[in-house]
């Protein structure tokens, strides 16, 4: 999945600043920037390989749609070891809200 959907959602409903990055989207909020990787359709399981790819691209977060993608235990643990957080989109939005991003709807 490209970052298109996430860009559209964040621009239309939040005060976070996003670039047009693909495959890595920079999301800036409250003086902080997270670099987000959204898995491609063939990466419907977030494994250690996907975590390594995201890290190599410079990601700090892997955010995914829980309707078609899942994170394996191995993938989450390896990502954590690499310093990359793995979360569904809903979790990413909750994280942003906890960090001070304002959402309009």
Where are these regions (language model features)?
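Alpha-helix initiation/capping motif
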Residues: 19-22, 47, 72
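Conserved catalytic cores of phosphodiester-cleaving nucleases, focusing on short active-site segments
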Residues: 24-55, 59-65
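Solvent-exposed, well-ordered amphipathic alpha-helical segments
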Residues: 5-9, 30-34, 78, 88
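Generic detector of well-ordered alpha-helical segments enriched in charged/polar residues
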Residues: 4-8, 51, 76, 93
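Acidic-basic catalytic patches of nuclease active cores, encompassing PD-(D/E)XK
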Residues: 1-23
């Amino acid at each position: 999945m490209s970052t298109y959907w996430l860009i559209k959602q964040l621009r239309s409903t939040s005060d976070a600043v996003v670039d047009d990055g693909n495959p890595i989207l920079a999301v800036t909020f409250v003086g902080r920037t997270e670099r987000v990787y959204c898995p491609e359709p063939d990466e419907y399981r977030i494994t250690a390989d996907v975590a390594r790819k995201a890290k190599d691209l410079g990601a700090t977060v892997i955010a995914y749609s829980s309707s078609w993608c899942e994170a394996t235990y191995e993938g989450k643990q390896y990502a954590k070891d690499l310093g990359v957080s793995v979360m569904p989109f809903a979790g990413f939005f909750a994280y942003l809200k906890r960090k001070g991003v304002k959402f309009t709807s």
